[in-house]
């Protein structure tokens, strides 16, 4: 995409070359379909674009270090944790048994044996108990038979039957319970070839740390022995393996403290987690829980983490910040080809992709990166697009997913924000909240982003009225503005003084973000606000077929903003014919082909460039000439610093 404009200050033609959506993918892999791509067996080799994190995980696995992974959702944090379980050194896994304690029933004993031996021990104890029961049953049957035979011989049939029944009940009542001596298999690692991986995300204290069942419905009846009511926690099941906790900062502080204790001691006793239950009276011996903790979350999670827990991870492990984009190189595009093949293999219900369909997925990865020369690493969302395209191809009975299926899948798998944005544009246009033709004083079509990349039209109106205060005028902005947005509006006053030469101390300038009920945050509307205010002060109409976005410095330079692709596409959907964006954002533009002929994209460097393209009417030329004179005068009258 190549766009040429004239710089309003120098009158020189300046060309800008942006990323083309038609840009060749240039993969080094040779393939016809994704079926030709070999999918690695090891999970660690399936992780895309996180080379630094992978190297850290390998070191952590080799030395059994804890890891804290911080990053955006969908960049591969849980996959890294699972891969670490495969990489852990092969150790002797253990089965954990809990035995009854004859001396103190509320303090069950704990035993650890090699994996696979636990079930054998339990079966041996059960067989012994069963053998004892059979002997006792045989003895009881002999006694009852003797009584019955004796009664028949003495012609006392009824008395013999009654006596046999009484003896049977008595023997049952006073029969010693040998079955209570059978241990319970708490953790079973039989047949496991790799270290256990336990996902404890969202687990409550009982599930994480272990618990003791305390009511008849849970424990199996009144009088159930204490050791049979003991339940292992996830920290015990992760012994010699990996315990993964996502969004660890949402966990209660008390639970984090107990988790820290388990990490330090590598053993943790199981007790009832409810203080008001009978299970709280039971406390087992310390149960082995020698696990590697892999915690994850976003940056906000750090605020909710216990300082000592984070210190433990940092002191005995690593902190890793995950990338959300990777450079757009042939090697990295090859990795996305591998990613498509992996997703097809994992799903198992969708057909493979043709080469052209894979290239369309790569182009979408470029768009979703949101910046030039980059590919997105939010692969969970990209995987959703792969599966949606596969579903479409499957529904039409195709053997391969083609480019048309991927394009159709983009519509099918739109995010909630994108669907809301589409309806927002239709509704606002229907009721003329924003306009896409004609000219109007003090009214500008700004552009904004909701969610990650869904653009919307943000109409802004400005009006200049005589100041109510005798001392000075004010800038009054409405529309639930956030802190950054309020500061951006305040900065506009300096630009108005510089570019118009107007003394605004005699005016109250009112700025309204029309129907912005959900609030406005960020400074990407600075250009729009400045244009609306200057239009209102000078009474020069703004072209309503133009939409604009960009941040402003107090010197009038247009600074880059995020989400330009989504904003441009939203403007095109709304019928806008020209969009002004910061010149430094031109490389980030990756709009869909269908929008290329619908809208003209104009890069701007200064507020003067913006006004030249946004304003219309007879007063425009005189304003721009006056602005140029003021811009030339201001530097010349500035005092030079004194030389000593």
UniProtKB/Swiss-Prot annotation:
Active site residues according to the UniProt entry: 524, 567
Which residues point to the Cytoplasmic side? 1-137, 172-644
Q: Which residues bind ATP?
A: 71-78
Q: Which residues form the Lon proteolytic domain?
A: 438-617
> Where is this protein found?
Cell membrane
Q: Which GO terms describe its biological process?
A: protein catabolic process; proteolysis; regulation of DNA-templated transcription
The family database entries (CDD domains) matched by this protein are listed as:
AAA (cd00009)
- TM segment ranges: 138-155, 156-171
Keyword check for Membrane: yes
Q: Name one GO cellular component term.
A: plasma membrane
Biased composition, class Polar residues, residue ranges? 1-18
Molecular function terms, GO-annotated:
ATP binding; ATP hydrolysis activity; ATP-dependent peptidase activity; serine-type endopeptidase activity
Task: State the annotated membrane topology for this chain.
Answer: Multi-pass membrane protein
**InterPro entries linked to this entry:** AAA+_ATPase, Lon_arc, Lon_proteolytic, Lon_Prtase, LonB_AAA-LID, Mg_chelatse_chII-like_cat_dom, P-loop_NTPase, Ribosomal_Su5_D2-typ_SF
Instruction: Describe the protein's quaternary organization and the partners it interacts with.
Output: Homohexamer. Organized in a ring with a central cavity.
The record's function comment reads: ATP-dependent serine protease that mediates the selective degradation of mutant and abnormal proteins as well as certain short-lived regulatory proteins. Degrades polypeptides processively.
Q: What is this protein called?
A: Archaeal Lon protease
